């Protein structure tokens, strides 16, 4: 379900010359050229196991065009999912969150590594 985990598994499968069908949560093609779904994944409960964004090699002035009062912002995600069950929404109904110290650690890493001092929380449900 988490794209960060799936993309790493796809890269590992590619580098090992393995079939993409071994990676759950992906649409791919079978040997006959027909689309197949490799199966559902269980949502990751512990968001601290998801790799943090690596901005190395990214021109942050070009990437982060969102400037507020002259400051470049980077996205921070503290939670995923939602506690509500709105019928019109595609957000997963499993609410998961990161511990405060994990979020603070990521912010401090971004400040130290990239000199970024402004962040935008991109959570779907900030007050969950």
Question: Where in this protein do the model-derived segments appear?
Answer:
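Glycine-rich beta-alpha loop elements in corrinoid/cobalamin-binding modules
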Residues: 1-43
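Electropositive phosphate-/nucleotide-binding environments in soluble metabolic enzymes
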Residues: 4, 44, 76, 80
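Radical SAM [4Fe-4S] cluster-binding motif and immediate context
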Residues: 53-128
């Amino acid at each position: 379900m988490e794209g960060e985990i799936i993309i790493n598994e796809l890269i590992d499968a590619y580098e090992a010359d393995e079939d993409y069908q071994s990676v759950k949560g992906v649409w791919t093609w079978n040997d006959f050229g027909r689309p197949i779904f490799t199966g559902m994944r269980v949502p990751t409960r512990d968001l601290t196991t998801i790799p943090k964004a690596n901005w190395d090699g990214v021109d942050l002035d070009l990437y982060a065009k969102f400037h507020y009062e002259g400051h470049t912002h980077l996205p921070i995600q503290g939670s995923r999912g939602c506690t509500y069950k709105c019928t019109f929404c595609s957000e997963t109904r499993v609410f998961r969150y990161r511990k405060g110290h994990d979020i603070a650690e990521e912010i401090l890493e971004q400040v130290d590594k990239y000199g970024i001092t402004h962040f935008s929380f991109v959570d779907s449900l900030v007050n969950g």
